[in-house]
């Protein structure tokens, strides 16, 4: 990892071993929350990941029309340049809105799947960048406007390679 991605190794070392180790912010693990007072939203990190990725995967328990609406302009832009994505959702507690799924199905570059067995309740957003680098956001945020912008949510963003 150090020869191909020295900045990634430095970021992991600074984030998990020694805070004083020099590293670029882009590669540091980040705790992501919605904080109106600091003008921070989980949504900003999701949008940033989408705008800089070559491919992406979402795995969320719930999707709502409000959640899709927060991403719609970026999804349109990704479709225009052929960036592919896969989204896995659940029907757990029947919270996912059918209209949100219909809206996502309109994108030719997206593959949408629904987990129908068990209590599928994961929440993860994975973005592949150039050079086989990946950014993963994992935590409590579903694909709803409230979860991505206002709810009390805890998420961790980490970067890694595919090795």
Residue ranges and their predicted role:
Residues 1-163:
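PLD/PLD-like phosphodiesterase catalytic module centered on the HKD motif
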